[in-house]
Amino acid sequence: MALKTFNPTTPGQRQLVMVDRSALYKGKPVKRLTEGKNSNGGRNNTGRITVRFRGGGHKQAYRLVDFKRTKVDVPAKVERLEYDPNRTAFIALIKYEDGEQAYILAPQRLAVGDTVIAGAYVDVKPGNVMPLGNMPIGTIVHNVELKIGKGGQLARSAGTYAQIVGRDHDYVILRMNSGEQRLIHGRCIAAIGAVSNPDHMNISIGKAGRKRWLGRRPHNRGVVMNPIDHPHGGGEGRTSGGRHPVTPWGKPTKGKKTRSNKSTDKFILISRHKRKKK
């Protein structure tokens, strides 16, 4: 889908660049496949802010997207492509031959009327799902499982994908968009193709109000706060903060390693940080 610009009737319209969604379904989602979604304004169950600068925004219904694709060897027809406010990618409504409906992540080049299927050995075409170990080397995939049966976790955002670059016994070597290469068990499933809406990276919000519609509140820098509010705060006049950049809680930011799951380090063959060190 192409990008859409607007006549500069206002400053917000002048800057605005959006994805053309005219080809998507314009009605409401399937009610049985949606759930209510409470807005928490970045607060947790105790009422404390856990994510700053969140709140407001348009009311949204959560679409129940099938990331597991456990209905094996049953063909499904793509009924329509839809917008989903909860994610950057588009979703597709599919209808199985037995009448059951489900939402899936829509890959690129998937069209209304296409047939998709999940199984051990299926055609390598967008939307089909099979175990990574049965796919040929070089295949572009998305919605990749990390644990067998858990459902897809990797490459789910708009335009993202991973590529199978090799095999190692029961595992396959997967290269991510970030440059990271890691081992994933061959029995983990993945969907073929790249995720839809690759132009999402090129949009321009245009004005602050549109960010508010998305539930994003103004982001304040630490150097303009008081010392009680942030380690960078205070000082007479404008300052540079006076120390290496830190979070409001004093922890180093900008480059500090935060990964703590050492038990899965053995599955990462090439770190995504390796390119930065060159």
From Swiss-Prot:
Pfam families: Ribosomal_L2, Ribosomal_L2_C. GO terms for biological process: cytoplasmic translation. Coiled coil: none annotated. Transmembrane segments: none annotated. GO terms for molecular function: rRNA binding; structural constituent of ribosome; transferase activity. One of its GO terms (cellular component) is large ribosomal subunit. The keyword Ribosomal protein applies. Residues 222-278 are annotated as: Disordered. Keywords: Ribonucleoprotein, Ribosomal protein, RNA-binding, rRNA-binding. The keyword Nucleus does not apply. InterPro entries: NA-bd_OB-fold, Rib_uL2_dom2, Ribosomal_uL2, Ribosomal_uL2_bac/org-type, Ribosomal_uL2_C, Ribosomal_uL2_CS, Ribosomal_uL2_dom3, Ribosomal_uL2_RNA-bd_dom. SUPFAM superfamilies: Nucleic acid-binding proteins, Translation proteins SH3-like domain. PANTHER family: LARGE RIBOSOMAL SUBUNIT PROTEIN UL2M, RIBOSOMAL PROTEIN L2. One of the primary rRNA binding proteins. Required for association of the 30S and 50S subunits to form the 70S ribosome, for tRNA binding and peptide bond formation. It has been suggested to have peptidyltransferase activity; this is somewhat controversial. Makes several contacts with the 16S rRNA in the 70S ribosome. Belongs to the universal ribosomal protein uL2 family. The initiator methionine may be removed. Part of the 50S ribosomal subunit. Forms a bridge to the 30S subunit in the 70S ribosome. This is Large ribosomal subunit protein uL2. It comes from Rhodopseudomonas palustris (strain ATCC BAA-98 / CGA009). The gene is rplB.
